[in-house]
Amino acid sequence: MKKLLAAAAVAALALTGCASGGNTETTSDDNTFVVGMECAYAPFNWKTSEETDTSVPLGSSGYADGYDVRVAQYIADELGMDLEIKTISWDGLLPALDSGEIDAVIAGMTANEEREQGADFTTPYYDSEGMIMIVRKDSEEATYTDIQQFSGKNVVGQKGTNYDDVIDQIQGVNHVTPKQQYGEMIVALQQGDVDGITAEMAVAEGVIAANPDLTVVQFDEGKGFEADTTVSIALKEGTRDSDSSKKFRKL
């Protein structure tokens, strides 16, 4: 939790620099911190009909909750601003940031070379236990210990994410067209349309808890995927070079 809040503090200061002369402009009033997320990626962010101590209203359509919502609320509190969560599809998040529709993307997003061409990222606020595979519990794949055993199998990942990119590390895999959300992939797995779903452990634990017919394949050391599994906050390009942001990174 300390690591989470420290990273949130960095982002808060970066945004303070933005508010005092940076280039971020949003459609909301100056006292509202607008954050974009899918609200479909538990435990990082999800939509619920029930209000909790950590949830944030989504207009008249329920509430946003999760790890990312807590980070967003912390930053808003540090800035002395109101928090507004906008539900945006994964592939629309960075365009919304660039256009000024939102102030930040806090959505379980990993910084990579392509994304850094159009946005600035804070230091990571989360590092997962690594990338794994979700499979049917009663399947042969549940006994696998090496990603190469999925050669010839149908494997799917979420569109526009590292989880889709890494599938090609499996030689001879049938790389299924990626899906927008995990819900679609889970249905495909349960119906036998795919043999495995790439994911990180934090996400997989929630999937398994809700779907006891599924299980997780954790690979032996040196036999798994090679991927960056850290999560950072995306800010509008140029924000991270502000003087206030540089001061915060010394904390």
Language-model region placement:
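C-terminal motif of bacterial Sec signal peptides marking the signal peptidase cleavage site
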Residues: 12-17
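Bacterial signal peptide processing site
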Residues: 19-22
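Extracytoplasmic small-molecule ligand-binding "clamshell" domains
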Residues: 25-109
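Short loop->beta-strand "edge-of-pocket" segments that line small-molecule binding or catalytic clefts
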Residues: 34-35, 54-65, 146-161, 175
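Short helix-initiation/N-cap motifs at beta->coil->alpha
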Residues: 67-69, 85-95, 142, 177-191, ...
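Acidic, polar ligand-binding/catalytic clefts
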Residues: 82-149
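A ligand-binding cleft/hinge motif common to bilobed small-molecule-binding domains
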Residues: 92, 109-118, 166-169, 195-227
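Periplasmic-binding protein-like
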Residues: 127-135, 209-249
